[in-house]
Amino acid sequence: MFVRPGAEHFMKIVIISDIHSNLAALEALPEREFDQLWCIGDLVDYGPRPHEVVQWVKRVSAVTVRGNHDNAVGFSVDPQCSPPFKRLAAETLRFTQDVCTEDDVTFLRALPGHHELKVNTTRFYLVHACPTDPLFGYCPEQSDRWDEEVLRINADLLIVGHTHTPFIRSIGKTTIVNPGSLGQPKTGRPLACYAVWEDGTISLKEYPYPLKETAEQIRLMPISPDDQDALISVLETGALPTGGH
């Protein structure tokens, strides 16, 4: 938890990332009253309900930035996933593009690579991966790369996603916040992750959701049973897929 010294009253802002077409997790979000919701990218791929997720985010999110999977669906390019996810990404990309409407694709294409804004006196920089590589830069919490990344921006809080693991880390005058993944967390627990900024304080949160519902929908996706098993395993274990995918 990070508390900004001398912070005045701030809006309540819910921050989500890496939904990956998991509508059941999104609809189970426990926050019902907030001033704004921000989405840090990767609305689509892997999961069974991309169209509904895109429309939800389009309707609810005040600020959304583009993730590597949004970019892949929007422009028919490689999302450049890590080896354990390459096959799953390729298989579900085809499904996602078949299911998404022209309106969905137009929305994904138009998403910015990053967004800067100020809430009262606090400066925010929102980007899916990292400032120097907005779509693909992979920076875990303890990466030395963050020392350089924070020098490239002028912000009190740098909000990122991409790694699917939540963390809060301060470097100099900048605090880096990763809310984790709402739709495909890699925490070792089957709990959806997000963050809340309220009254000058940011905190990481997680919650259970009807995973069985998402698993049943994955079974209906036109991909191989092995790939279905791998996707469900990731959700159930909060870990990398098995079976060499």
Regions found by a protein language model. Give the residues of each.
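Active-site metal-binding loops of divalent metal-dependent hydrolases
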Residues: 17-19, 41-43, 68-71, 129, ...
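Core catalytic region of metal-dependent phosphoesterases/phosphodiesterases
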Residues: 12-103, 109
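N-terminal amphipathic/basic-hydrophobic helices that include classical n-h-c signal peptides
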Residues: 1-10
